Amino acid sequence: MAPREHPHPDLHEVELVTVLAALAEPTRLRIVRMLAAMEERERAWKDIDLPIARSTLSHHLKILRNAGLLWSRTEGTRCFVSLRDKEMEGRFPGLLECVLACQDSVDVPMAKGGVREDRAAS
Amino acid sequence: MAPREHPHPDLHEVELVTVLAALAEPTRLRIVRMLAAMEERERAWKDIDLPIARSTLSHHLKILRNAGLLWSRTEGTRCFVSLRDKEMEGRFPGLLECVLACQDSVDVPMAKGGVREDRAAS
DNA sequence: GTCGTACTTCGATATTCGTCGAACATCGAA
DNA sequence: TTCGATGTTCGACGAATATCGAAGTACGAC
């Protein structure tokens, strides 16, 4: 289907385990990190370049959306996603921040523009 | 088997996804919260009172241990577990703290002493 | 209207995970 | 040494999950 307007949960109704489960998957964590590392606050669905099928990507984005982690916006037949980091900070203070700050093996080698070199290098 | 000395991972080798996955399960999150809410820093294995089989509990404790979240110590035939919160703070600054601080539906109604009333009430 | 693009949903599959009871291993006590 | 207590491991099971390709749906362009 075309990107029909998706339901976005009220963050007050999102449970911590849901958020943790959403983040506890390498591909999804990578997506979150990529969105956080961008200069623009939005990323075009089409430009999310990962070695997975598009249907799988759609699946992961849905899980992140249901966990309150990202916002998707429709523009014609296209879709743009962005982190709900401000809201998440209100609901789970410090969580997203420390997840993003942490250094581990899940990197952000996602081409097609938007990756900040300065962050990637630190 | 009796509580043979278990392997505890070096926290530098523990990945964020491993920790998140360990925490992203209601029973395990409950165990972590219970350990954090205790006055004594240790809890006897035997006194962890949850509505699950003992083999299941053993399984969950192993996952938490492998994620670097808890430490288990053997004393004769008994076992005592405690949070590795200080070390986790060094590896993933702020993570455990904000997970414990967050308010959601996973409570800590675990009897047999050790639950702090002041925390439970806040 | 017809076609193509852009996502989403469906159905199928393989893997992982939570759970249990039973069997096992280790220690202390009798 | 025999017994009981204490955890752990094993084997099995159903449920959940990550993945894909194919089919479907909505929109813009022509």
What label would you give each PLM region?
Chain A
Residues 73-74, 98:
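A generic structural-conservation signal
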Residues 55-58, 72, 82, 105, ...:
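Generic serine detector
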Residues 45-72:
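Canonical helix-turn-helix DNA-binding module
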Residues 31-33, 57, 65-68, 76, ...:
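Sequence-pattern detector for short linear motifs
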Residues 4-13, 28, 65-66, 74:
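Short leucine-rich amphipathic alpha-helices used at interfaces
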Residues 1-15, 33-38, 84-122:
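Amphipathic alpha-helical dimerization/coiled-coil segments
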Residues 41-42, 67, 98:
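Generic macromolecular interface patches on structured domains
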Residues 18-53, 75-87:
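N-terminal helix-turn-helix DNA-binding core of bacterial DNA-binding proteins
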